[in-house]
């Protein structure tokens, strides 16, 4: 048997983790001692060595990123503003047109709405744009080894995913050097973790490999396969925005048939009707009685098999609806006084770009590029205060 890879590891680690030579020795020992567990799962020494060749340290960013998951920590209106907006709709329609034949074939074979698949692609990798930003990607075996070594809460998960990742490499679906993904090991256009890839991966383009990194058809078909196998009901929606009767908050979380909800006074905005009156739906009021209300059907919970966050599933459903021609929510979120809404965020970016301060995409995401532009604008105008987007800033931009 080929000897298992042993190498020097220079650890650049977070607080509470060992540093310097001690971290190097401990991580090196972990890599060595994990091999027997991988071997029991059928991983050869050749595959193991190839996967860890050139790895000289744990991934220093993984544990930091593990502390922040926006779908669970961001206010729902901010989360949705950045993911369901005119930019993501425009880009989605363009991407769908480029991949229409594949989408038609996938929709026909798996019985999953193409707009849902496009929305997932957007939410997961911005229609693949994230995959070209190498500075944001992680080498999956290294990221998972880092979690297994240094994150006790996620060690079991990481070990299971690492073995699955090694199986993917061993099967020849992807070269080790090309197995990139998120800090948690989510991979490719549609961000599948390794175990889910092994269960649901599809070779849709017929080249003999399930390649969700380079093949859009493979990635979208793999997403469709997951939804299909978890009970997606073709021809039915994920849910409805509804106008609730007064004092409906006590009903939040209850499940009834659509017909029963109608009898209680729930209706769709614009008095549009419900298609399936016998369908069961759960009332959700994510921001309480002061915000939008939704009746969520079985397909909403199928989307949650992809990502367990309600915010995520709501974003997928809302974006899919707008890709299909919907105009979006009728009711407004109860934003704090002075908070920007989605249109105002777009306007700030648009005006900064028109004035020559901002050169990026007008996508409503007021990130570091936008803040640099705001700082330059404020300096030029002699404005005091922090370079943050605000209604006051927008007033200055409008002058």
Each model region followed by its residue ranges:
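Bacterial N-terminal signal peptides that target proteins for export
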Residues: 1-9
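An acidic, Gly/Ser/Thr/Pro-rich helix-cap/linker signature
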Residues: 24-109
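Sec-exported extracytoplasmic/periplasmic mature domains
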Residues: 32-48, 53-60, 108-111, 122-129, ...
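Acidic helix-start/capping segments at beta-turn-to-alpha-helix junctions
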Residues: 48-72, 121-125, 135-142, 241-246, ...
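Acidic/His-rich structured neighborhood in mature extracellular/periplasmic domains
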Residues: 77-228, 238
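Cell-envelope/ECM-targeting effectors and their regulatory/trafficking segments
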Residues: 142-150, 164-168, 253-399
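Flexible, glycine-rich surface segments
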Residues: 176, 180-305, 313, 331-332
């Amino acid at each position: 048997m080929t000897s298992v890879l042993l190498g020097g590891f220079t650890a650049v680690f977070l607080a509470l983790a060992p540093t310097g030579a001690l971290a190097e020795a401990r991580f090196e020992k972990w890599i060595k001692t994990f091999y027997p567990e991988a071997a029991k799962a059928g991983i050869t020494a050749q595959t193991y060595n190839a996967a860890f060749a050139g790895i000289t340290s744990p991934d220093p960013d993984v544990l930091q990123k593990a502390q922040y998951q926006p779908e669970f920590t961001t206010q729902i209106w901010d989360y949705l503003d950045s993911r369901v907006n005119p930019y993501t709709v425009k880009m989605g329609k363009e991407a769908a047109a480029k991949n229409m034949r594949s989408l038609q074939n996938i929709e026909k074979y798996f019985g999953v709405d193409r707009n849902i698949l496009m929305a997932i692609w957007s939410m997961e990798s911005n229609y693949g744009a994230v995959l070209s930003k190498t500075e944001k990607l992680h080498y999956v075996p290294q990221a998972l080894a880092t979690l297994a070594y240094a994150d006790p809460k996620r060690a079991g998960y990481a070990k299971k995913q690492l073995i699955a990742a090694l199986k993917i490499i061993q099967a020849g679906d992807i070269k080790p050097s090309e197995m990139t993904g998120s800090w948690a090991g989510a991979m490719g256009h549609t961000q599948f973790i390794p175990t889910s890839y092994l269960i649901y991966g599809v070779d849709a383009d017929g080249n003999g490999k399930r390649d969700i990194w380079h093949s859009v058809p493979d990635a979208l078909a793999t997403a469709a396969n997951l939804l299909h196998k978890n009970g997606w009901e073709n021809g039915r929606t994920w849910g409805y925005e509804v106008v609730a009767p007064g004092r409906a908050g006590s009903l939040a979380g209850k499940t009834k048939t659509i017909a029963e909800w109608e009898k209680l006074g729930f209706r769709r905005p614009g008095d549009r009707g419900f298609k399936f009156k016998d369908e069961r739906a759960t009332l959700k009021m994510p921001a309480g009685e002061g915000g939008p209300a939704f009746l969520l059907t079985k397909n909403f919970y199928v989307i949650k098999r992809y990502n367990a966050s309600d915010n995520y599933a709501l974003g997928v459903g809302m974006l899919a609806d707008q890709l299909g021609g919907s105009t979006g929510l009728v009711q407004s979120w109860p934003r704090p006084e002075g908070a920007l809404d989605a249109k105002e965020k777009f306007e700030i970016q648009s005006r900064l770009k028109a004035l020559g301060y901002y050169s990026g995409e007008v996508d409503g995401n007021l990130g570091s590029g936008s803040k640099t532009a705001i700082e330059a604008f404020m300096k030029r105008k002699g404005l005091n205060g922090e370079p943050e987007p605000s209604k006051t800033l927008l007033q200055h931009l409008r002058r």
